Amino acid sequence: MINTPTNPLAGKHLVFLGSSVTYGSASGGESFADFIGIRNHCRITKEAVSGTTLVDEGSDSYIARLKKLDRNEKADIFVCQLSTNDASLKKPLGCISDSVDMDRFDTKTVVGAVEYIAAYAGAVWDCPVVFYTNPRYESEEYDRMVALLHRIAAKWNITVIDMWNDAVFCALDTAEQAWMADSIHPTRAGYLEWWTPYMELALWALLT
């Protein structure tokens, strides 16, 4: 990728919120977010802490860290990871609220936390809000989270980059299986060769 007028991400500021997959825990602390910044000559803010949850419990939760981001700094796209930690820890899913009032969302549930993040980011930065999923792995809990995310997206008019339900994307051959360090975390090669081009195309589409 080069910095040309045909690259809609060039010169933009992208904010990424997440946990170990956004951080790049199996890739030396570099993930697709970093590679998108380099390849597209855009600035990124990567707020990612391994092991953290959407559900608002403690100072490292997604919401706690979201509130520490600079509200006055312009963002062109806000991207949030649908955390696998909430599924692994079996956090309560909750229900989609009838309200659009952030103060009424139950952020001790996955749904309430996702709604809060979507509402907050949209209100603060007035930019496209994106949630992305992991590719498919064995988890009934995460499958339910993805289904609920699509319903939340319809309510809030946000974008879902859904690797979970992309059968072609998830179908790795024997050699490509080395792109995953485990069932959840990509390797550096996995980010570079597999995730980054996919995410780039989805993010490009938001600005064209």
Report the location of each language-model feature:
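A short acidic, glycine-rich active-site loop
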Residues: 99-110, 184-186
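Catalytic His-Asp segment of secreted/periplasmic serine-dependent ester chemistry enzymes
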Residues: 134-208
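Active-site segments of SGNH/GDSL-like serine hydrolases
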Residues: 81-85, 115-149
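Helix C-cap/helix->beta junction micro-motif
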Residues: 40, 124-125, 156
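Short hydrophobic segments within beta-strands
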Residues: 17-18, 132
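Conserved SGNH/GDSL esterase-like catalytic core that processes O-acyl groups on lipids
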Residues: 10-15, 21-104
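Catalytic phosphate/metal-binding cores of nucleic-acid and nucleotide-processing enzymes, i.e., regions
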Residues: 2-10
